[in-house]
Amino acid sequence: MRVVLLILSSLLLITAGYGQSTNWTYPGNSYSDGSGTGGLDSWEGDYTYLTEGGSVYECFDYSNGSAGTWYTPILKTYSYGFSLPTGAEITGIECQIKKTGFGAATWYDYEVKLYVGGVQVGDNKAITSTPYSGEVTDTYGGPSDLWGLTPTKTQIEASNFGVGIKCKAVAVEYDYNVVIDFIRLKIYYSVPSGSSPFFGVPF
């Protein structure tokens, strides 16, 4: 019986390190990065607005724009405050963004990219061909998607790690706006197994 229990304990230690993830996590800071076009000068709001069910971030033009294709600045979010176990190896990054387009324009994603070390890098996960039809929540990345990167635990935990979105408006006249209700991230990771307490060898 004792041997069986030791073997079971070893198996639990082996499997415990796989398929783990953080909870959905909201940013601790944000700002409007760069400049937009067509009167879409900046994002208005605060990072505290980017939690589910709260206020919304907004980028708008009510008088200065015109018919054409225009772009918002990047809404950059960071300071997610992740804390991963010692030895964690990142296996995937998932992002969800809830957004709505309004007014005399059809709205699309233009760019959804990560910030690592404060620099925008990796794959562009924007869903560029599908317009925002009412209020939508889109998912980018996933449990085995690293966005073309090899991020480390240290990079994920850094305050300058985050994600940004840039939107595109195909406008027929002035008076159009887009709002972001929330942006959140989830990190998937594994922890390499240590030594077996029963066999005394690495596994």
What kind of region is each of these model predictions?
Residues 2-34, 38-39, 181-203:
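Enriched but not universal
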Residues 61, 78-79, 93-95, 124-176:
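Cysteine-clustered segments with highest specificity for TGF-beta superfamily mature ligands
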Residues 67-86:
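Short beta-strands within extracellular/lumenal beta-sheet-rich domains
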Residues 86-104, 161:
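A short beta-strand element within beta-rich, extracytoplasmic domains
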Residues 105-119:
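Short, surface-exposed beta-strand/strand-loop-strand elements in extracellular ectodomains
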